[in-house]
Amino acid sequence: MKTIIVFLSLLVLATKFGDANEGVNQEQMKEVIQNEFREDFLNEMAAMSLLQQLEAIESTLLEKEADRNSRQKRCLGENVPCGDFPCCGKLACEKTFGYGWWYKSPFCVKPSKG
């Protein structure tokens, strides 16, 4: 009988002080959860900014690669009438004496020196 009274008194004391600590524990848990969410949010924001920076770098690299691998636009060869289309490479669109009088248009020729 004495042991039952001791256990019951311990039970009452434990429940009384347990309830008092429960409110403190809940507040601490709320603070911990808020801090974790805050840290997760900051980590997510840092990851998003890093992702945006990587995407910007990737887009510039892809543009450079596309420019490097792209074909030369269509152009006209030597001794071909030019007008709408540009002449290839080192050729220039000039009026010449040889073909100009017949076709009445400039031709792609090598530029004259001098």
Swiss-Prot record:
Domain of life: Eukaryota
Propeptide feature: residues: 21-74
Cellular localization per UniProt: Secreted
Entry GO terms, CC: extracellular region
Name the record gives this protein: U17-barytoxin-Tl1d
Main subcellular location of this protein, as a coarse class: secreted
Record-linked Pfam families: Toxin_22
InterPro entries named among the record's database cross-references: Toxin_22
Tissue and organ expression note: Expressed by the venom gland.
Paired cysteines (S-S): C75-C88, C82-C93, C87-C108
The keyword Signal belongs to this UniProt entry's keyword annotation: yes
Role, per record: Ion channel inhibitor.
Family stated for the protein in its record: Belongs to the neurotoxin 14 (magi-1) family. 03 (ICK-30-40) subfamily.
Signal peptide (from-to): 1-20
Domain notes: The presence of a 'disulfide through disulfide knot' structurally defines this protein as a knottin.
Keywords recorded for this protein, A-Z: Cleavage on pair of basic residues, Disulfide bond, Ion channel impairing toxin, Knottin, Secreted, Signal, Toxin
Gene Ontology molecular functions: sodium channel inhibitor activity; toxin activity
